[in-house]
Amino acid sequence: MRHQKKGRKLNRTASHRKALFSNLAASLVIHKKIITTDAKGKELRSYVERLVTYAKAGGVHGRRLIQKRIPGKRGKEIANILIHDIAPAYSDRQGGYTRLIKLNNRKNDNAPVSLIEFIDIAPDITEAEVDEGTHKEKGEGNTKE
């Protein structure tokens, strides 16, 4: 029984989860907004908020902690974006740097999908790129005519 165990396993091995969150976090930092499943988005939220907190602390230690969480070629680039662009925007905020907006279920497998984005930071992608998962109004849907 998994009593008092934090986090979702997402049906992946530990190394696969580590790589998944590293890649999702890097994409979120670069694009400021991504679309993913609800479960991944909920886990990614705490992962990214910790990275922003490290960036706010700044210094060599914070940079190394970020690069430890996002290894590889993109680690330095992500650390620079977090420290120089994102962290200053949240200097007066104590947490809650991201928001999760639920969208329609994905068409092919009906998976619940969400948009995760940074609060108060303009995204780099356009609304047309996000339109594939926009909200449906009540009453809309597949109606036979």
Please describe what each predicted stretch is.
Residues 1-19, 23-145:
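Structured, basic alpha/beta domains of bacterial-type, RNA-associated proteins
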